[in-house]
Amino acid sequence: DTAAQATPASRTLGWYVWNGQALLDHPARMTTLPKGSERILISFTAPQLRALTRPAGQKRLLQLIAQAHAQGLRVELLLGEATWVLPARRQALLDLLAPLRNLAFDGLHLDLERSQLPPAQQPSWDEAVVDTLRAVRAAIDWPLALTTHYRELQAPDFARRIQDTGVTELVAMVYVSNPVRAAEIARPLLQGPPGLRLAVAQSIERSLPPDESNYLLGQTQALRRWHQLSQVLETLPGFSGIVVQSWDEFKKARP
């Protein structure tokens, strides 16, 4: 078996794709995604995003999304810059989004993490992220999702406050490679407010230690672990799958 076919799976896998331009240039690469893949979260640089708003760029994006949909994949725009939560930087995010709002993405996915802010600004993250998400929700029509560390979701009322901004999905970064332990962490998070979906982010990054990342296990074993984790959680209401950080790192891992 190749890694792509290793584990029969329900369609619960998603992938962070930080080099979206490579996929735009070579859409056929999507056919190498493992079985069970249902979504790609795809990111571009600011100049690449500007190019997508021009007729030629829009045409290529539509072709990519059409091919993805034919494979049963959703395509969500992924943006990640920690400082966007700060009041002084919030408008920069809104300005970036304004010309993009009519593009054919299936959703907008923001990766916003407290730990990536300067230490002095971390205590105000909770309020800042809520205000930012509310502003983004008012500016776009796509479904809106947030990726952040699972510890944020353990705070009382955090998930409800995020849902109140108009976010429909949270992705909890549970960078724990042991699927039993990862399920123990994720299970209570799925007791959140009704209607808010929750996915679990897992890592196959080379730079992380083996207790956090599945990189050293290789593709086939990593897929087995994610399938195991998904099977444990998919009986719980609101579970919306596993999202892997990242597609590029997965391809570098051994089969």
Task: Briefly describe each language-model feature range.
Residues T2-E38, S43, L79-E81, W142-Y150, ...:
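Boundary/entry segment of secreted carbohydrate-active catalytic domains
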Residues S10-Q21, L73-P87, V129-F158, R197-S207:
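Aromatic-lined carbohydrate-recognition surfaces of secreted/lumenal glycan-active proteins
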Residues N19-P34, P87-R101, E152-Q163, A182-I185, ...:
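Short, acidic/polar
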Residues R29-G36, A56-G72, L97-A104, A159-T165, ...:
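Acidic (Asp/Glu)-rich catalytic clusters
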Residues R39-Q48, L96-W125, S240-S246:
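Active-site groove signature of glycoside hydrolases
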Residues I42, A46-G80, P119-L146:
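Aromatic-lined substrate-binding rim segments of carbohydrate-active enzymes
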Residues I42, A46-L49, F105-L108, L112-Q116, ...:
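Aromatic- and acid-rich polysaccharide-binding/catalytic face
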Residues Y175-P179, L198-P255:
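Substrate-binding cleft of secreted/luminal carbohydrate-active enzymes
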